[in-house]
């Protein structure tokens, strides 16, 4: 991610005072209104940046959970149907695998938005 550090904060903009001169300058109300807009934009940007960080952390967590679930599915998958002694055990394992695969699918949708 590129460096998004800002030179000014909303507080810096709000507290900025311009030197007053006797010569004709800009209308104070117009400058204040413009600075208010800039402050609002800076605050929105800071809020959006915080949201991006939060979503990035959540995305990382979900990817890790997805990988763990894939590993569990891979290790719990039966190598051969003969290794199970009863149909009940096979049915329970198959049902459990289907549940895990559904969860993986839901996590993929949440992480990748598909």
Curated annotation (Swiss-Prot):
Coiled coil spans: 42-77
Major subcellular location class: cytoplasm
InterPro entries reported in the protein's UniProt record: Cell_cycle_GpsB (IPR011229), DivIVA_domain (IPR019933), DivIVA_fam (IPR007793)
Keywords: Cell cycle, Cell division, Cell shape, Coiled coil, Cytoplasm
Ranges for region Disordered: 74-99
Subcellular location: Cytoplasm
Ranges of biased composition (kind: Low complexity): 85-97
Subunit architecture: Forms polymers through the coiled coil domains. Interacts with PBP1, MreC and EzrA.
Protein family per UniProt: Belongs to the GpsB family.
Function: Divisome component that associates with the complex late in its assembly, after the Z-ring is formed, and is dependent on DivIC and PBP2B for its recruitment to the divisome. Together with EzrA, is a key component of the system that regulates PBP1 localization during cell cycle progression. Its main role could be the removal of PBP1 from the cell pole after pole maturation is completed. Also contributes to the recruitment of PBP1 to the division complex. Not essential for septum formation.
Protein name, per record: Cell cycle protein GpsB
Gene behind the chain: gpsB
């Amino acid at each position: 991610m590129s460096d998004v550090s800002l030179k000014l904060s909303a507080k810096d903009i709000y507290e900025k005072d311009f030197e007053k001169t006797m010569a004709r300058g800009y209308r104070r109300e117009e400058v204040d209104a413009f600075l208010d807009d800039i402050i609002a934009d800076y605050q929105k940007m800071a809020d959006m940046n915080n949201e991006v960080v939060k979503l990035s952390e959540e995305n990382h967590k979900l990817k890790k959970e997805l990988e763990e679930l894939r590993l569990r599915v891979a290790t719990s998958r039966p190598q051969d149907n003969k290794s199970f002694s009863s149909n009940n055990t096979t049915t329970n394992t198959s049902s459990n695998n289907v549940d895990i695969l559904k969860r993986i699918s839901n996590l993929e949708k949440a992480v990748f938005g598909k």
